[in-house]
Amino acid sequence: MNPEWGQAFVHVAVAGGLCAVAVFTGIFDSVSVQVGYEHYAEAPVAGLPAFLAMPFNSLVNMAYTLLGLSWLHRGGAMGLGPRYLKDVFAAMALLYGPVQWLRLWTQWRRAAVLDQWLTLPIFAWPVAWCLYLDRGWRPWLFLSLECVSLASYGLALLHPQGFEVALGAHVVAAVGQALRTHRHYGSTTSATYLALGVLSCLGFVVLKLCDHQLARWRLFQCLTGHFWSKVCDVLQFHFAFLFLTHFNTHPRFHPSGGKTR
């Protein structure tokens, strides 16, 4: 294991493992989740193994892992703090792909719950990264933020749309904090990355929600809205990386008042 990113990878793997253990105890079994091929516009292909029953929707999840590996191995002129933040985010992407693939493969409620739950701390991490740019290295603040993010999934136990409410709040917080960071320290380059990231996020949401409606059009009958929503999701990951690392690799735009690790 590369020592430069090994610690971050272990932290993400352990946290994800603890979430999996919690889910498999059954504490979230009452959460409303969509399970079954009928929720996807891509029709399952007879004769293919279960893990490839919807081949395009399944294989696109490899893009998360490839993106995570790519960013884990990127270096650049970064201090220990920014490198750790980058590596945690990359490890999240790397491990998120297999979780989503497991959900498609098994069509198991608990796999769907785990997929939902792990989405929240992923959206919370850019907020933590922006706080680092503004306030410096505060690991307990970042840990507290992630714990609050994970705890917010409890809303799914209280209401059928609780997860959507929690996710919406995470998206608003991430975009709002990114806008604040750009306003204080940004450039035309960071503005481009931010705009592309927000557009990718909108594409992710709209294409996923309109999966079945879009399937009426020939363009979306083979590669469906769900497939393209995952492409947009990977792109928003990538543009978030570009936006956030821009401030660490271009000292001109780095906040002058923040303490670095």
From Swiss-Prot:
Main location (coarse class): membrane
Topology class, membrane: Multi-pass membrane protein
Record flagged with keyword Nucleotide-binding: no
Domain of life according to the entry: Eukaryota
UniProt entry keywords in alphabetical sequence: Membrane, Transmembrane, Transmembrane helix
Pfam families given in the database record: TMEM187 (PF15100)
GO cellular component assignments: membrane; transport vesicle
Ranges that cross the membrane: 8-28, 43-63, 88-108, 113-133, 140-162, 190-210
Subcellular location: Membrane
Tissues where the protein occurs: Ubiquitous.
Annotated protein name in UniProt: Transmembrane protein 187
Species of origin: Homo sapiens (Human)
